[in-house]
């Protein structure tokens, strides 16, 4: 089943120039893509190529300058109030900048309960039980529930944001460099959790990343973005080989897992 369909999406930002006239900076240009239930897809690209802007459009935080985004066959622009509430529950995003994604005055307990209060019909006791369950799933415990964001490390706060997104059991989870920024042990744990969600609920995942190793370990399909366009799409096999210049640049930038020892006869 197709969850998300994007057709001819373009987006620009207006900013003032020295002459006082508004100038337009193109960020996305004619982007089209589809995401299916239970699918794991990577959006791969260097910083500044338009990945995060695309993600903000997909979750409805901004409206595109041109093109259409459909969720389960319905255009986002035409959703009624009830449909929009269901959409906000069904698609969740974990931002790269976790500090800006939470209210620093609220406790972790309040942060985790917030989407459940607005998007689910759960009693308070059920919300608290699920909050504890989600914390455990991301390798945190109840000791952080009464803490506020400034009292947490960056990695802890990022996992709190992931737990918050998972609490409403979304049908699509968008992760903007979220897993890439965790250490390898936590990465493996989160990936196991996401696989479990896929099996249990058919949750689809869109990884926005520049981490090629993550793509190879977990994703079924990869899209390469460069200068606001998707320049390549392919299935992920045993050995990824890119045809686009942008894909090859990212692949060549990957360091070996272990240092390569030089021979004594090699010149440095």
Curated annotation (Swiss-Prot):
Q: Does the keyword Amino-acid biosynthesis apply?
A: no
Cell compartments where the protein resides = Cell inner membrane
Instruction: Cite the entry's keywords alphabetically.
Output: ATP-binding, Cell inner membrane, Cell membrane, Ion transport, Membrane, Nickel, Nickel transport, Nucleotide-binding, Translocase, Transport
What membrane topology does the UniProt entry give?
Peripheral membrane protein
The transmembrane residues are none
The broad enzyme category this protein falls into is translocase
This enzyme's EC code(s): 7.2.2.11
The reactions it catalyses are: Ni(2+)(out) + ATP + H2O = Ni(2+)(in) + ADP + phosphate + H(+)
In which broad location class does this protein mainly occur, judging by the first location in its UniProt entry? Answer: membrane
Family named by the database record: Belongs to the ABC transporter superfamily. Nickel importer (TC 3.A.1.5.3) family.
Spell out the NCBIfam families in the cross-references: nickel_nikE, PRK10419.1
- Function comment: Part of the ABC transporter complex NikABCDE involved in nickel import. Responsible for energy coupling to the transport system.
* Protein name (Swiss-Prot/TrEMBL): Nickel import ATP-binding protein NikE
Gene from which the chain derives: nikE
């Amino acid at each position: 089943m197709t969850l998300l369909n994007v057709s001819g999406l373009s987006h620009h930002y207006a900013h003032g120039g020295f002459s006082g006239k508004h100038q337009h900076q193109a960020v996305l240009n004619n982007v089209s893509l589809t995401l299916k239930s239970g699918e794991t897809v990577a959006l791969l690209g260097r910083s500044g190529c338009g990945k995060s802007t695309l993600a903000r459009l997909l979750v409805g935080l901004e409206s595109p300058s041109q093109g259409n985004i459909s969720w389960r066959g319905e255009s986002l622009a035409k959703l009624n109030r009830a449909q929009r509430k269901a959409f906000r529950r069904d698609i969740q995003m974990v931002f790269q900048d976790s500090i800006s994604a939470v209210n620093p005055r609220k406790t972790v307990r309040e942060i985790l309960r917030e989407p459940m209060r607005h998007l689910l019909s759960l009693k308070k006791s059920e919300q608290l039980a699920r909050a504890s369950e989600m914390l455990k799933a991301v390798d945190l415990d109840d000791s952080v529930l009464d803490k506020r964001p400034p009292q947490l490390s960056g990695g802890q706060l990022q996992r709190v944001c992931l737990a918050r997104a998972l609490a409403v059991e979304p049908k699509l989870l968008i992760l903007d460099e979220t897993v890439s920024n965790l250490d390898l042990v936590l990465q493996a744990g989160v990936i196991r959790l996401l696989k479990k969600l896929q099996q249990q609920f058919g949750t689809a995942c869109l990884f926005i990343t520049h981490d090629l190793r993550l793509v190879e370990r977990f994703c079924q399909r990869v899209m390469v973005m460069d200068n606001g366009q998707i320049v390549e799409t392919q299935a992920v096999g045993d050995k990824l080989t890119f045809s686009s210049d942008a894909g090859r640049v990212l692949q060549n930038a990957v360091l070996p897992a272990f240092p390569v020892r030089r021979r004594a006869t090699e010149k440095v």
